[in-house]
């Protein structure tokens, strides 16, 4: 059994990490549509610990697991990830002195694999054909087989995933753009969309929340879910989205090049997909302020970026 001192030590270390989570800047997205009455803004989520939006959920999951004595120094943090959450777990885990094991689809980018290895995480690869669904199943099986060994974070079912955005991302958006009209974001674990939208709806019921998903099952937007053909995350609340728009992978990739040309630095495929969705929405409405999320930059997607830019 872990000692109370050991658990308290983790809590103390957590306090030093928290200032580096969230509070990301908001960027006005210009040059991609012609409607002067519509403004698009995006949160630059790589401007925090571990370099992606997933730092928010990973930190909140770990923090609450430690406070509830579910994650102790003698247990391994276990979860399935397409990359970014795994990197966030590994980054925070390294700071806390915790061991981390990630179930990762084998087609994850080489950069993500290398980052996870450099942070000391154990990687167990699953089939590229099964995606994160297969990785989730494998993680669950491993946790059930050795419950004394692992804390299974289960980001797709863990309420602390969406709560990180309810208490963090949404509050920041309300502070930065209190008069927003639309929030639009892609669906992966669905935590970002669910948590942010839930809080925004409580703040102002007139705010429209639009979910984005790939336009068909065989897509190349890693981490995103095509809800009709995959296991829907337990934390997803279908009543929250006013609409669901579909985004094409190739069109999304075009926005990587467009963004680079306009702003001078590249972004990830999922960030470009959110911009593509926001622009699609901008062309459908007469006026309004749209807020979206740029989950990460292009640092972990070299192979994709080289083909586009």
Task: Cite the ranges covered by each PLM segment.
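PLP-dependent amino-acid enzyme catalytic core
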Residues: 1-309
